[in-house]
Amino acid sequence: MMTLLAILAVSYIIGSIPTSIMAGKMLKRIDIRQFGSGNAGGTNAFRVLGWKTGLSVTLIDIAKGVIAAVSVVAFFRMHPIGAYPDINEVALRLLAGMAAVIGHVFTVFAGFKGGKGVSTAAGMLIGIAPVSMLIVIGIFLLTVWLSRYVSVASILAAIAFPLIIAIRKYVFELGGGLDYYIRLFGESFSFHDSLDYHLMIFGLIVALAILYTHRANIRRLISGTENRITFGKSA
């Protein structure tokens, strides 16, 4: 139990790093939450700080999820403290990743007012199911490019994830997942692309959560007042 609590605590702290808020204060000496949509996430960083900074913020927020789901769990596997909980590996990584997402949304470093958690959740799932997430990222990027609405892309990507897991697992009968091997710089690396049923359940919950956190965006989309991003502005 102590190990599980340590994993969740470290993951929460990693997720709490307020990337967009730090970028706003360092680059323009502003609180990004007072501009644009008022959200402390990558999407608002694109609007307020420009696409280069927005992209950097988004990538760092994604990395927070990857680190929580992969590195933190792996570290405590090698250096356990107390009794290790008897829990499914994928479920454990999901718990660690969710702790990071909660940290991003309710950051302890910025008055518990952070972003919406989309990028950090994506990072967590990249660490657990990278192939499925590559498909989801493709859907996200294509939707952003065609519509210029990051909110629409986020919603569609969230809905697509559990569907992709289900199709790969049951239609293509890939079971619990696949192991992949790559060779870089003369070294061989392996990674597991999970199709565990926990992912489908989690994916459905995330899709509902994304719809809930984007309810204001949905209202603006219906009224035609939702902000579009541009790719010509830089900071």
Swiss-Prot record:
Transmembrane intervals: 4-24, 56-76, 94-114, 125-145, 152-172, 191-211
Record pathway: Lipid metabolism; phospholipid metabolism
Protein's GO biological process: phospholipid biosynthetic process
Keyword Lyase among record annotations: no
Highest taxon of source: Bacteria
Protein localization: Cell inner membrane
EC class (word): transferase
Primary localization: membrane
Reactions it catalyzes: an acyl phosphate + sn-glycerol 3-phosphate = a 1-acyl-sn-glycero-3-phosphate + phosphate
Cellular component terms per the entry's GO annotation: plasma membrane
Membrane topology: Multi-pass membrane protein
Keywords (A to Z) from UniProt: Cell inner membrane, Cell membrane, Lipid biosynthesis, Lipid metabolism, Membrane, Phospholipid biosynthesis, Phospholipid metabolism, Transferase, Transmembrane, Transmembrane helix
HAMAP family: PlsY (MF_01043)
Oligomeric and partner information: Probably interacts with PlsX.
Annotated function: Catalyzes the transfer of an acyl group from acyl-phosphate (acyl-PO(4)) to glycerol-3-phosphate (G3P) to form lysophosphatidic acid (LPA). This enzyme utilizes acyl-phosphate as fatty acyl donor, but not acyl-CoA or acyl-ACP.
Protein family according to the UniProt entry: Belongs to the PlsY family.
Name assigned to this protein: Glycerol-3-phosphate acyltransferase
